[in-house]
Design a protein with these regions (language model features):
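Structural beta-sheet core signal
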Residues: 184, 220-221
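Accessory nucleic acid-recognition modules appended to NTPase machines
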Residues: 15-181
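Short, small-residue-biased leader/transition segments that mark boundaries at the very start
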Residues: 3-10
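Mg2+/Mn2+-dependent nuclease catalytic core
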Residues: 190-210
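Active-site ExK catalytic segment of metal-dependent nucleases
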Residues: 181-193
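Short beta-strand/turn micro-motifs composed of small residues
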Residues: 164, 221-223
Length: 245
């Protein structure tokens, strides 16, 4: 189950995030398994994760993004595992459906925080800075959407994945229930990319082997806009604030 449900480790008050990171580095992380870790490396890994949020950055990329001489890949992996167990990171695993063609599906996870406010704190981002950097804002918004989708899917007994294949056809989120039903989701902060996102979802849906996997229950473009509606092509467009289990 997602660490977002029933865990006091997860932060819901944005103002708490910087203090939480400080407390984590000071003591909490050592309580996971009793091992003492390099606080400088830990802080740099958190910042690197924040800079690579909502991407499929490899551990090598995470390490290369650190300042100074980075630790070994094995050390980075161990630190990431500790931060995952501490409910700081919560990567999104890849979905592997049966496709009509033999398209290679990527298996790398998408990097996410359990609560995106921790990423905002690690970046030192402010509302004004985010308004001036829509690329970062969009990636953080995507992670916010993943957090909420995970919360609702936990309540429904389902899981959230992501999909990307070698042609770069993707779904930012794939919602999967225990009975096999699924839905495809793209996340877009504004309204301009909605048409392209809807076309992308339709294309992906057509590639899935419906005889084995079934048809998608719905296709959804999740946005930061204000209005929910169903397009003529059947794709649902809905603001994040409208979600409910």
């Amino acid at each position: 189950a997602s660490c977002l449900v029933g865990s006091e480790m997860c932060i819901r008050d944005r103002s708490m995030a910087p203090d939480y990171i400080s407390e984590l580095l000071d003591s909490d992380i050592d309580e996971i398994d009793g091992l003492r870790r390099n606080k400088t490396w830990m802080a740099q890994i958190i910042r690197s994760y924040a800079r690579n949020i909502s991407t499929e950055a490899s551990l090598a990329t995470i390490a290369a993004d650190m300042q100074g001489e980075p630790p070994s890949r094995n050390t980075v992996s161990e630190y990431v595992d500790a931060l995952t167990r501490s409910c700081v990171f919560e990567d999104l695993e890849a979905w592997g459906p049966r496709l009509r063609s033999k398209t290679a599906v990527r298996t790398s996870p998408t990097r996410h925080f359990c609560d995106p406010s921790l990423a905002v704190a690690a970046l030192g981002a402010t509302p004004q800075k985010l308004l001036e950097d829509f690329e970062t804002f969009g990636l953080l918004f995507e992670s916010m959407c993943i957090r909420d989708l995970r919360t609702y899917m936990d309540l429904l007994g389902g899981k959230v994945y992501h999909y990307r294949d070698k042609t770069d056809l993707e779904a930012d989120a794939v919602l999967v229930l225990d009975d096999g039903r699924y839905a495809l989701v793209e996340v877009k902060l504004g309204s301009k990319p909605i048409d392209a996102a809807a076309a992308n979802l339709k294309k992906l849906a057509s590639k899935i082997d419906a005889a084995h996997q079934g048809e998608a229950s719905f296709l959804l473009v999740l946005t930061g806009t204000a209005t929910a509606y169903r397009r003529e092509d059947g794709v649902v467009v809905a603001p994040l604030a409208s979600l409910a289990p």
